Amino acid sequence: IEFDLWADGYDKTVGISDEENTYPFAGYKKVLGFIFQTIMRAENAVVLDIGFGTGTLTAKLYERGCSIYGQDFSSRMIALASEKMPNAHLYQGDFSKGLVEPLRSFRYDYIVATYSLHHLTDAQKSDFLLDLRNYLKENGKIIIGDVVFETRKNLEQCKLKAGDTWDNDEIYFVVEELRKDFPDLSFTQMSDCAGVLILD
């Protein structure tokens, strides 16, 4: 429900935080730009977006000829994204329970999650990412853009700096801890609190 209420003003909220270079969305445009450039290296990629929101990133990929599949738990977000991408295959579903059935029938060049997986616990994140690997094509990649920290200490420093604006309901990625399950992951930092993770 909260994301339905937030849907109309979501892009605006993100923009303000990014321009001011403040948590949580500092580096947001850099993150999306980096992911966009990575995916555009492949021609007509098949992309699954987990928690696509209003379709900010996927609409750009859609315009460039990518086949777009997606799952989001907000019907309002799906309605907004469908306006931008009428031929995309978008499904409603809670990804804390995994992928919805129709999306399990396909294989993807890229599975993308931007600012969505921090709603899962660390254990849920690892389980979900391990499961998502089963839906990649050969040489496919999972790309995550989110609030990410190299170490637990970096996270604590950001939390201190953010003060009252810190969201205690969100559980952010810590690279050194995620490497236990995904030793080959690559991490590119985009701001004090944002980065891109790539898993093969």
Residue ranges and their predicted role:
Residues 126-138:
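A short glycine-rich, Lys/Arg-flanked "PGG" loop and its adjoining helix->strand segment in the class I
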Residues 44-51:
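Conserved class I S-adenosyl-L-methionine
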Residues 112:
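A conserved beta-strand element that flanks and buttresses the S-adenosyl-L-methionine
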Residues 115-116:
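Short catalytic micro-motifs in class I SAM-dependent methyltransferases
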Residues 1-39, 54-102, 143-200:
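Class I (Rossmann-like) S-adenosyl-L-methionine-dependent methyltransferase catalytic domain
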